[in-house]
């Protein structure tokens, strides 16, 4: 497809020149032709179309267009449109047959191209639809892959959980097997122990049977009796049986059975009596603890050592009751514990009653306020309540006794009772061991408390001795300071001691019967002391000494005042305790004399309680 210039005749117009130049300069190719055909087909059919096609070939450039077409067709492999000329100078002529054949071939090619184009378009549509289908399938498969991955992850997690559960179950199974093995070993050991105990019991039973047989036979041999010469027949007229080995063995068995039944009956009665006594003692102990339970004290009352010991004893007994049950112990340990606890409670009750008596006597003689003393009506009400509680307790004890009798009335077989007793022997042994260790600990604690109590008693004795020495020196000084003696104003006021012959001045009684004279005063507000001693010489053994000591204290000082009044002391009662002893000490708060007197009184009361124990 060349760039060639056509030779135009000079007669051609300018328009044909431009067309020939355009066609000669452009590169013509089948693709360009096809594009031109498409463009031509796309142009709407109008007058411009006719003008466009007529612009290529006109009447002026027919030869040029034919030559151009011939050249193009030859380049595409079509035969030439001109006939072959014989001479060079002769003009070539147009071959119409060749032109028609070329046109036909061009039309065939056009149809083929159109069919191929349609086929390509249909194939393209098919491929597009296939592509869409494949894309949809791809998206679906991708979603299925994601879901399958999620399901696989869930299944893996579930598999892991199941494996963990399986491992735990294997571990539990192993533990259960170990526990079963341990239990089997324990059962085997207990079975061997039970067989051993059974054999031991059988040996003991055989020994006891032999011992009983020996005792019975020895009694028969040693028994002094008379032989009957003329045997009197039986009342029913039957003849007595001969004594043979079988009859003697049968009689011995019957005798053993009768003896064993008697022993069992007696043992049941003794057990019933022990149970009843245990219940009665336990009820008594509970009632005593409830009676002696520490009440709320008034703020005016002072707490002394004796009340502290009472509260501690009650708390210890309550702790013992909650710690162990009396029914599980043996008779000896129960008896010892109950007797000790009842003795303690009895001491506490005795001291409590003595304190109440002392309080009542103090109220009557010293004129305390009615608020600090229990009234008679309250006392009677309390006694009535206690009587009602005692009646209720008695009824409860009766009902318990009836229930116990009903339970024990149901007779059990000897074999079952023996088996039950044998079963509980091991538990009783273990319980006894534990109780023995607890008893040892209690004994150690008791010894420790006893040592501390003895040390406290020794300290109290030393303090008391020092106080007695100080008081003796003070009394000696007061006695030496006595200067005036007045025999006319002496009254029947007698000095005595609660324990005559001892130096227990805490039990002295203070009581002034008549108003005393005013003491002499000293200038500048100094304390004035006036002491009068009236002494009458004994004319006969029945006369007694009269003494009055009075210490007068200045208005500005607040020291202790001790007024002493004594009753007549008989000569034959020297060294013994005096009756109707009352004491009262009016002291300021913080005075040492009142504290020492209270300590000595509690100490003497505790000694009296120990001496009065049953």
Curated annotation (Swiss-Prot):
Functional note: Belongs to an adhesion system, which plays a role in the organization of homotypic, interneuronal and heterotypic cell-cell adherens junctions (AJs). May connect the nectin-afadin and E-cadherin-catenin system through alpha-actinin and may be involved in organization of the actin cytoskeleton at AJs through afadin and alpha-actinin. Involved in cell movement: localizes at the leading edge of moving cells in response to PDGF and is required for the formation of the leading edge and the promotion of cell movement, possibly via activation of Rac signaling.
Alphabetic keyword roster: Cell adhesion, Cell junction, Cell projection, Cilium biogenesis/degradation, Coiled coil, Cytoplasm, Cytoskeleton, Nucleus, Phosphoprotein
Species in which this protein is naturally found: Homo sapiens (Human)
Protein name: Afadin- and alpha-actinin-binding protein
Alphabetical GO biological process terms: cell adhesion; centrosome cycle; cilium assembly; intraciliary transport involved in cilium assembly; regulation of cell motility; regulation of Rac protein signal transduction
Main location: other
Compartments in which it is found: Cell junction, Adherens junction; Nucleus; Cytoplasm, Cytoskeleton, Microtubule organizing center, Centrosome, Centriolar satellite; Cytoplasm, Cytoskeleton, Cilium basal body
SUBUNIT field: Interacts with afadin and alpha-actinin. Interacts with VAV2. Interacts with SSX2 and SSX3. Does not interact with SSX1 and SSX4. Interacts with PCM1. Interacts with WRAP73.
A GO term from the CC aspect: cell leading edge
